Every structure is written in structure tokens, then in C-alpha cells.
Amino acid sequence: MTVTFCGHGDFHGEKAVMDWLRETVGALILRGADEFLLGGYGGFDACAATVVWELKKKYPTIRSTLVLPYLDRTVDATKYAGTLYPPLEQVPMRYAISKRNDWMIREADVVVAYVTHDWGGAAKALAYAKRKKKEIINYEKF
């Protein structure tokens, strides 16, 4: 099972959300999740990567992949098993992150979300996941 994440960039690692994220990812692993696609941009992405990295110590067979929106940027991939660049060569740079997000959602079986308002990139990604009829686990419904 493949899992991806979407959430607000201004997330700062609030304890209640982090606890929920650990519990949610752990439960998904027990359900068979073994591949985690992560975006690497913003606060929620960083926290999701940290949680998956921590849980890899307990579940060594899980794999975390940093999905890159650009090829010309240097990134810190130390918390990931590897990186991947989806087929975005023809996408204008200003759309690369949203198109990368769409790609991750299409590839995933489950989307774990921290979306608390209905504007911005995280809200657009969540709306896309709903249109694609993905299983969505959202911290806070609005």
C-alpha cells in the first residue's frame, strides 16, 4: 500500500498533530502500508518525513521516497530511502509543485492530510484526492 501526505506549509509540529500523525502512520503500516511518498516542502511535509523516518526503526521494511518537483535544486534527502522525479519535464516551473502533488496522489492508495482551511496548495491537493476517490485521513475536517 502506498501513502502520501498533504498539509499546510506553515505547520509547526504541534504535539497533538504529531501524536495523531505517528498513530495514523503506525496504523497504516499495520494495514500493509510499505511505501511513503513525501513532498519535502513546508512544515507538514517535514513532520511527516520525520514520523516515517522514526517508524522505520520499528518497521525496517517500509520505504520513504522524496518526490522532487524540480531537478535543478539541491535537497537534503537524509530522511528518505531515495528520491524520485516524476514525469514533469514539460510542466512550467510555477506549476511543478502542484503537478508533483497531483502525481503523488494518483500513485497513492491513501492520503494523510492536515488541511484546516479551504485555500492554498494543501487544500487544492486534498480536493484533487477527493476527485480521485482516494482514501483520505484528515486531521481536521472543515
Segments from the language model and where they lie:
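Acidic/glycine-enriched connector segments
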Residues: 1-142
